């Protein structure tokens, strides 16, 4: 009857999913499952916990499959019709209210029982152990045949779970309790024995993390197995606390490796976690160069090589390798400080690097450092008398700085000579240098420090091939001579600058005041002007203004070279006449003076002009040529006359004072307008076009060197 009635139900369910041809097989499976579920229910009520123990094994073995089996088994209860109306009519017709009771049990137990199509009679107690696997396969087959069962089963499971929630909860609890008993008898007992042995091992001998991890994995499988059974009831099985204890022991043993074996603790009392952390930092700094480059000549591996000295001090020394520590404050021993910190005292660094073959760890480092400092001092004193010609002061003052700068260079260069090298240096650089790979070079390094000392004073990079190439007699005088030569040149230039301005200003002054461009012919003026223009480099804006004004206005080619040419050349009247024709006309003088007076608004210009012109006339060109320096000094000291004014203009010192005076000087002689190039530059340019026209070539060029040199 069930078969005939169920097909329409399946058709309803399968039509939406288009699986009609499997209806009969699916219904048969449902019927069988339902019958088995009923039998289970009866057996549960009758036998109670006996079934629970047997079924617990099945649940424990395939507890993971319960989720998959539950939806499939519960298809029949889904038919009860509570979850969905579509399922309601067919399910109710097929299965009477007895099925409602059935699904409750089936939700928890039919999962294993579904797959057993045969042995319904014997299924009561024997089937569960075998049924789980068989049902799993059968359920999958049903899934293949009728994919509709999954949604139905899920719905039915939910419904049954809702209806018989109380019963379902009770049954798993009993199962779990039974499993707890079973696990305590089986797995926990074995685990307890194993764990007991393991504990003894952990206590007696420190086990490495790897071994314990393997043990933990094995135990974790057991703990997971038990946790699935025991977690819902929150009742711990016998083996779980033991596992927890074992983990506690493992944590204790984890600390032991950090503390290292007992012998290291005895030998190196200060090392433990700090030493481990330092090893990490140390490896990161060293890279592949490894600790073998530091411990000393023995080349012993890092931890062993330091047993020779106190572990605390060496441990402090090595962190300084990491470029972050101040060597003096960190180590408290400059002699042992490795030479790579770049932040500790440079003299100490250079002294250690040069005198200590390992660059650190040398007990005599302090003495060598003192010797090196003394040598540096003696080096300064040694060459100071030779450098009296201007080199002594600069060299003596600069030497400390230069020595510090070169100590860095010496560090890198001499570290390369060290037998084992240092951390920052690649091996390919260290190889090929004299002494690389040798056990010790203490004999060579003192001489090396001597040579480097000289090079340090000279500011040159020390060479590493031969030691006798850099003797103080050979190298130092060169440096001193070069510097002295440059200094002598500077003195000469200063003399020229001081002298030439006097000549140029003086001759220019007189020539402009007297109204002629000196005795240089016009053609010569052009050449002189061209050469001077090429050399022209104004110093500042004021000089630029003066330069422009002078180039446009100045009738004479006064520069230092111009003065010399004036002396040697025949005093030609052509230049003088040329200037006189253009510049000495009274009309131009008046017009120019009027223009300047209007702009500068200075009264009494004519009177001042007359007095100044008289002073100018008193001085002759011959006197200017013979008494240049004296006349200039006298005039300047007196502060009067054209000389003072011109000195102020070109010297820039009395620019403001000259401005009021400039108008008369310009007015006095358009001839002398050339020297006037300072404060009234703007006014002068428009006012003396004639002067610009007359000798543009020679005009400004002469004054230009004067400005430059001043």
Curated annotation (Swiss-Prot):
Region spans: 2 X 23 AA repeats: 648-696
Inducing factors: Levels follow a circadian cycle with higher levels during the day, in a calcium ion-dependent manner. Triggered by water stress, osmotic stress (e.g. salt and mannitol), diacylglycerol pyrophosphate (DGPP) and abscisic acid (ABA). Pretreatment with lanthanum, a calcium-channel blocker, prevents mannitol-mediated induction. Induced reversibly by low temperature; by both acute (2-24 hours at 4 degrees Celsius) and chronic (5-6 weeks at 10 degrees Celsius) cold treatments. Levels are correlated with the rate of root elongation in the cold.
Keywords linked to the UniProt accession: Cytoplasm, Phosphoprotein, Repeat, Stress response
Modified residues annotated as Phosphoserine in this record: 626
Biological role: Involved in responses to abiotic stresses. Regulates probably root elongation in cold conditions.
Stated family: Belongs to the LTI78/LTI65 family.
Protein name: Low-temperature-induced 78 kDa protein
Gene name for this UniProt entry: RD29A
């Amino acid at each position: 009857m069930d078969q005939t009635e169920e097909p329409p139900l399946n058709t309803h369910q399968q039509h939406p999913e288009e699986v009609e041809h499997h209806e009969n097989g699916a219904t048969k499976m449902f019927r069988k499952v339902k019958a088995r579920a009923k039998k289970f229910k009866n057996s549960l009520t009758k036998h109670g916990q006996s079934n629970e123990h047997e079924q617990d094994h099945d649940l424990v073995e395939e507890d993971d499959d319960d989720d998959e089996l539950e939806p499939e088994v519960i298809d029949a209860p889904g038919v009860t019709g509570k979850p969905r109306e579509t399922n309601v009519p067919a399910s109710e017709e097929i299965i009477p209210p007895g099925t409602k009771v059935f699904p409750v049990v089936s939700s928890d137990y039919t999962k294993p029982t579904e797959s057993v199509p045969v042995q319904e009679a014997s299924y009561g107690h024997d089937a569960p152990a075998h049924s789980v696997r068989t049902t799993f396969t059968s359920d999958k087959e049903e899934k293949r045949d009728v994919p509709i069962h999954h949604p139905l089963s899920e719905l039915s499971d939910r419904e049954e779970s809702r209806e018989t929630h109380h019963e379902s909860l009770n049954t798993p609890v009993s199962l779990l309790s039974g499993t707890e008993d079973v696990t305590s008898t089986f797995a926990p007992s074995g685990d307890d024995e194993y764990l007991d042995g393991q504990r003894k091992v952990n206590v007696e001998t420190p086990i490495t993390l790897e071994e314990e991890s393997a043990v933990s994995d094995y135990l974790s499988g057991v703990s997971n197995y038990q946790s699935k059974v025991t977690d819902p009831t929150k009742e711990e099985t016998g083996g779980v606390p033991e596992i927890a204890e074992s983990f506690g022991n493992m944590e204790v043993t984890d600390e032991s490796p950090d503390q290292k074996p007992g012998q290291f603790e005895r030998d190196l009392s200060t090392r433990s976690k700090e030493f481990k952390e330092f090893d990490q930092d140390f490896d990161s700094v060293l890279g592949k160069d490894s600790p073998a480059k530091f411990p000393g000549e023995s080349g012993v591996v890092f931890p062993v090589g330091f047993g020779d000295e106190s572990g605390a001090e060496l441990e402090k020394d090595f962190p300084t390798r990491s470029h972050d520590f101040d060597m003096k404050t960190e180590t408290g021993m400059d002699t042992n400080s490795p030479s790579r910190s770049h932040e500790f005292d440079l003299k100490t660094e250079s002294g250690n690097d040069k005198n200590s073959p390992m660059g650190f760890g040398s007990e005599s480092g302090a003495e060598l450092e003192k010797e090196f400092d003394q040598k540096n001092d003696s080096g300064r004193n040694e060459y100071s008398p030779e450098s009296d010609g201007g080199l002594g002061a600069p060299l003596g003052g600069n030497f400390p700085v230069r020595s510090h700068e070169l100590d860095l260079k010496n560090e890198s260069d001499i570290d390369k000579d060290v037998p084992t090298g240092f951390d920052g240096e690649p091996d390919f650089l260290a190889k090929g240098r004299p002494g690389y790979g040798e056990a010790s070079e203490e004999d060579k390094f003192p001489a090396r420090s001597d040579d480097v000392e000289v090079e340090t004073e000279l500011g040159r990079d020390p060479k590493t091939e031969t030691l006798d190439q850099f003797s103080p007699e050979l190298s130092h005088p060169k440096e001193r001579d070069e510097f002295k030569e440059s200094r002598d040149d500077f003195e000469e230039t200063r003399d020229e600058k001081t002298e030439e301005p006097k000549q140029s200003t003086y001759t220019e002054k007189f020539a402009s005041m007297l109204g002629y461009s000196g005795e240089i012919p016009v053609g010569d003026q052009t050449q002189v002007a061209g050469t001077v223009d090429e050399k022209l480099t104004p110093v500042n804006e004021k000089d630029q203004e003066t330069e422009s004004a002078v180039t446009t206005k100045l009738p004479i080619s006064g520069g230092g070279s111009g003065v010399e040419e004036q002396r040697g050349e025949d005093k030609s009247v052509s230049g003088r006449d040329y200037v006189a024709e253009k510049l000495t006309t009274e009309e131009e003088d008046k017009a120019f003076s009027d223009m300047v007076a209007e702009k500068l608004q200075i009264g009494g210009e004519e009177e001042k002009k007359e007095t100044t012109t008289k002073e100018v006339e008193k001085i002759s060109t011959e006197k200017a040529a013979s008494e240049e320096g004296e006349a200039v000094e006298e005039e300047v000291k007196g502060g009067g006359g054209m000389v003072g004014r011109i000195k102020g203009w070109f010297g820039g010192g009395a620019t403001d004072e000259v401005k009021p005076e400039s108008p008369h000087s310009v007015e006095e002689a358009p001839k002398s307008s050339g020297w006037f190039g300072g404060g009234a530059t703007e006014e002068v340019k428009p006012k003396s076009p004639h002067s610009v026209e007359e000798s543009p070539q020679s005009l400004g060029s002469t004054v230009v060197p004067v400005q430059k040199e001043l």
